[in-house]
UniProtKB/Swiss-Prot annotation:
Gene3D superfamilies found in the cross-reference section: Ribosomal protein L28/L24 (2.30.170.40)
UniProt keywords, alphabetically: Ribonucleoprotein, Ribosomal protein
Annotated GO CC locations: ribonucleoprotein complex; ribosome
Entry GO MF terms: structural constituent of ribosome
Gene that produces this protein: rpmB
Species assigned in the record: Synechococcus sp. (strain CC9311)
HAMAP family in the record: Ribosomal_bL28 (MF_00373)
Coiled-coil zones: none
GO biological process, one term: translation
Family that this chain belongs to: Belongs to the bacterial ribosomal protein bL28 family.
Pfam families xref list: Ribosomal_L28 (PF00830)
Superkingdom of origin: Bacteria
InterPro entries membership: Ribosomal_bL28, Ribosomal_bL28/bL31-like_sf, Ribosomal_bL28_bact-type, Ribosomal_bL28_sf
Name recorded for this polypeptide: Large ribosomal subunit protein bL28
Amino acid sequence: MSRVCQLTGTRANNGMAVSHSHIRTKKLQQANLQQRRLWWAEGKRWINLRITTRALKTIQKKGLGAYARSLGINLAKL
């Protein structure tokens, strides 16, 4: 399974690790992904999602159905 958020599509970012002597090395910054089982009220069922903590925070604010609609995602297919 790839390390990609199923709702937002967030994936790893290429960055640089900079030491005290300013030597730069490439570094992969992974998304903070969590496996969650969320209740979808409109579908009256549980949905297993691998989502970022940022998406989880937005779901707590807006609700799963409303957030998925705003992203153009059909939860019935998940």
